[in-house]
Amino acid sequence: KGENASTPIVAQKTFEVVPAITALHIVSAPQLVYKYYEAAGVTNPANAEFATNTAGLKVQATYLDGKTRDITLDKLTISNVPMKAGKQEVTVTAKNGVKTTFHVNVEKGNATFVTPSPAILGAEDCSVAWWGAHLDEDIKVPAGETRAFSFTNLSSGALNYNNFVVVLRNAAKVEYAVVRADNYGWGNGYAACTLGCTGGVDWKTWLSGMNGAKVNVYVTNNNNGTADVVAIMQGTDGKVNTQYYYGINTVDANDFYVDFTVDCSCLKFDSAASARKHYTRAHRR
């Protein structure tokens, strides 16, 4: 109220001065094996990458004063994993530019391309609401095999989930899991899976490129009670984003099907020729 305090007000805070980092050391590296797929007639973008799963990653830093101690991952930048078969290098970088690396394994599998019916799922004006359109017939994925789907994704652009939706279920339409384009899902088998995506770094930019994005989705029946889903999206801005769901469980390997649905979105499925053309054009940009 403009009056002087009767006693002085004193405030203080203690700050810890942290010396500069001189070296980073990998104490333990993640053990996840990344998997991607190729199918005749379908081309994946050459610059596709996986988001690095950091489960199990522990890093220590050595500082200018010679002391070494644990450093939390939020103080580090971790590169993505190239979508290429073999041992791939991941770079860990401190804020002052000091780097170290570790390696992960990437495996390539083969898939069979499928064009489901109808060729256009949902209305092209994206007016069909959640769960309002499904395939005429679910696609069976036999034990130990992968099915590949390629389509143009149309979106209302209102929310992240207004895009393609993948439904994994049995012949009686009892769901194992449902996964969305924004790397989220649910179902009895979903909780156990390992998931990751590159688009989550900037959802706003990702969403702005999804109305007209070219998408490849690979669904794998691992023949061990689990299934995987990998999606590769090339937005209208040319940016490539990927997502994965590894180890969806509670799956009956002999009774496993995939369906697609929409949520204020539309999927225009490709033939093998049109799928190849989509990404060939992207490579020429």
Positions of PLM-derived features:
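Serine/threonine-rich, repeat-prone extracellular segments and beta-strand-based repeat modules
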Residues: K1-I9, F15, K67-N96, T100-F102
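Interdomain boundary/hinge segments at the C-termini of tandem beta-sandwich modules
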Residues: F15-P19, V104-K108
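Solvent-exposed, low-complexity, repeat-rich "mucin-like" stalks and linkers
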Residues: T22-K67
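Extracellular Ig-like/FN3 beta-sandwich strand-entry sites
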Residues: T54, A85-E89, G212
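Secretory/extracellular carbohydrate-interaction modules
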Residues: I120-L195
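Ligand-recognition surfaces built from glycine- and aromatic
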Residues: D125, W130, L135-E137, G144-T146, ...
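Short, aromatic/His-centered strand-loop micro-motif at the edge of beta-sheets
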Residues: T194-N216
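Short tryptophan-centered beta-strand motifs in secreted/extracellular beta-sheet-rich domains
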Residues: A213-N221, V229-A231
